[in-house]
Amino acid sequence: MASPYSVRVFPVSIPAVIMETDWTEPWLLGLLAFHLLCLLLTCFSAQRYKLQIGHFLCLVVLVYCAEYINEVAAMNWRLFAKYQYFDSRGMFISLVFSAPLLFNAMVIVIMWVRKTLTVMSDLKNLQERRKERKRRRKEE
């Protein structure tokens, strides 16, 4: 008898993936904890530029490897999951693994753009002050 959570033909739509997933599985809870830790590291690394670069690169590499992770998980799903979630299209791995990692990467890029704009603004203000000082010296 099939469980209401069993997936024979994996749905294509995101709401269907969310509804048909058994979110109480330990490996999914562990993945959720991993994503929360990544989000915390993203937030707390804002003042540490080198740490943030390393974190960003790790996120991008993990997203790049998602296809390979999906293939390995599809072959070995019985070792850690109740149901086969890993389809050839990669919808499930994209939703539960790659999307949160890409969100973190996007937050980091937004932080970098904001920081760059702040530095550019500060530089422009400094240039204006220097220009004003030079102008005053010439008037004297």
From Swiss-Prot:
Point out the coiled-coil segments of this chain: 117-140
Provide the membrane topology annotation: Multi-pass membrane protein
The entry lists its GO molecular-function terms as:
DNA binding
Claim: Disulfide bond is one of the keywords in the record: no
Residue ranges spanning the membrane: these are 26-46, 53-73, 92-112
- Which UniProt keywords are present, listed alphabetically? Coiled coil, Cytoplasm, DNA-binding, Membrane, Nucleus, Transcription, Transmembrane, Transmembrane helix
Keyword match Cytoplasm: yes
* Biological-process GO terms, alphabetical: cell migration; eating behavior; energy homeostasis
Subcellular locations according to the entry? Cytoplasm; Nucleus membrane
Predominant subcellular localization, coarse grouping: cytoplasm
Q: Which residues lie on this side of the membrane: Nuclear?
A: 47-52, 113-140
Q: Give me the Perinuclear space side stretches, as residue ranges.
A: 1-25, 74-91
User: Which residue numbers does the motif Nuclear localization signal cover?
Assistant: 130-138
Q: Source organism's superkingdom? A: Eukaryota
Per the record, GO CC terms?
cytoplasm; nuclear membrane
Q: Which family does it belong to?
A: Belongs to the TMEM18 family.
Quaternary structure, from the entry? Forms homooligomers, independently of the DNA-binding domain.
Function of the molecule: Transcription repressor. Sequence-specific ssDNA and dsDNA binding protein, with preference for GCT end CTG repeats. Cell migration modulator which enhances the glioma-specific migration ability of neural stem cells (NSC) and neural precursor cells (NPC).
Q: What is this protein called?
A: Transmembrane protein 18
Task: Provide the organism lineage as a comma list.
Answer: Eukaryota, Metazoa, Chordata, Craniata, Vertebrata
